[in-house]
Amino acid sequence: MTKPHYFSSNFQWQIIESLLTFKRKSKHNLRQISEAICYLTKTGCQWRHLPINYAPWGTVYWYFRKWTLEGIIEVAHQQLRKALRKKSGKKESTSLGIIDSHSVRMSSISGQQRGIDGNKKIKGSKRHIIVDTMGLIICVVAHAANIHDSKGAKEVFDCLYDLRFDEEKLRKILADGGYQGEIADYLKEKMNIPLEVVKRNDKNN
């Protein structure tokens, strides 16, 4: 019999399983549900195109929506990030964050999500991401590519605030020149965290 392939290790699944609140015995294996969600994230396939070795797509979607609304997926992400940091010999909490944006060319998304990034000449969507010093994602916000970095940064800082990430002793966030001025003031006022602009040609960068 072929050994099943898992996106998550047994250790990672233990962390995820400990967060699940579904008490009633399920017809489907919850790890397979979790793996199906990982497969969707990895491949970007449509729900209805999930391979048949997973649970029915409607069941997977039901659990995905339930775990999203309950905040389980976000909590699992943060717990897994902390575990990986600890395994790498670092403290679970990071004191330094890094923010940047990335525009992606897309043609099949809705008009509300699509726009033109004037600087990069890309029509599609843009992601604003805050990572820790290991490059692990703390939080991410996606929107149309024509949204200015200043507005996108506020959205991702709001996401950071909603996570109560200030409780993890985040002392500074590094950014490039597109995030100075009003954005730095917004972050300082909202979370009392300084934003340090690092020039791309800085020898220490």
Question: Which role fits each region the language model picked out?
Answer:
Residues 1-205:
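Short alpha-helical elements
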